[in-house]
Amino acid sequence: MPIKIADGLSAKEKLHEEGIFTIDKGMALHQDIRPLRILILNLMPLKKPTELQLLRLLGDSPLQVEVDFCHTETHESTHTDPSYLEENYYVFDEIKDNYYDGLIITGAPVEQIPFESVDYWPEMKTYFEWAKTHAFSTLHFCWGAQAALYYYYGIEKRLLPAKLFGIFEYQLTQKHHPLLRGFDDRYFIPQSRHTAINDIQVYNTPQLDILSRSVENGINIIGTPDHRRFFVLGQVFFFILQVEIILEEEYLRDKKKGLPIAVPKNYYPNDNDTKRPYFTWCSYAHLFYHNWLNIVYQETPYDLQAIAKVHPCAH
């Protein structure tokens, strides 16, 4: 939420430099307030746990948030009852005329398949095009981030020589970016993936800002200067409470089967899998969503249909 201060206060300029929202008395008196409308394209096979994680994070805000869920129509879900989807989810044709303050596109377990070979890829392209004019700011996660970077900017993904598995440190490259307000200079997040994007292509794309990265594992968070698109390479920011369980279950499952699996890096104290894992990423996930909703609240036009005109999105 913005803070109302006197227009001549000496701290005002510094606060603006740090990306902290302020308004004067006149703006406060005429400020229009309405619920934020958020659409979630849930690509995960297990829809219900993903819903719970995202709603926990979106609900931890003083802002009123109105959430719709949608799913791909061209892919038949085998892990969620069709009647549940029919009752609680939309398909594209049902929301295509709507406008949203924010859109969230989750990951999907298809990272090792070429984009064009994913059965719902044509539908993904439709969502990406639609988002240009119907959603102010979009969060893309994991495969959703890889897919969007490929569609919008032609950035390729690549197969890693070994699975990235464990808890990894990343450093901020834009400390005062509003999406990262309150983050420490470094933060730790879980990773469990076989692919990565081509970082060199990102560096050579002037429409993109790199917000955080690591020397060991490359880029983690990317954004556009107009805040219309953010890309997060990793699942921590929507599996906040489940990642601890997921990493351990995945490790113990493969170990029990005798499959080649390394102990998740930086996960167990002294790499001892009989001890309780460290849980070091929860606060960053809450902070991340708080900051994103604040950006959306401050910058989206009150009249959502004005999104395309007032905030043209760079291609």
Please annotate each region the language model reported.
Residues 73-86:
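N-terminal beta-loop-helix "entrance" segment that forms/cooperates
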Residues 50-53, 79-82, 115-116:
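Short, glycine/acidic-enriched capping/hinge loops at junctions between secondary-structure elements
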Residues 100, 105-174:
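Cysteine-nucleophile active-site neighborhood
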Residues 78, 149, 200:
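Active-site-proximal flexible loops/turns
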Residues 1-71, 89-95, 99, 126, ...:
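Amide-donor transfer/coupling interface in amidating biosynthetic enzymes
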Residues 46, 75, 111, 146, ...:
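Surface-exposed, flexible loop/turn segments at secondary-structure boundaries
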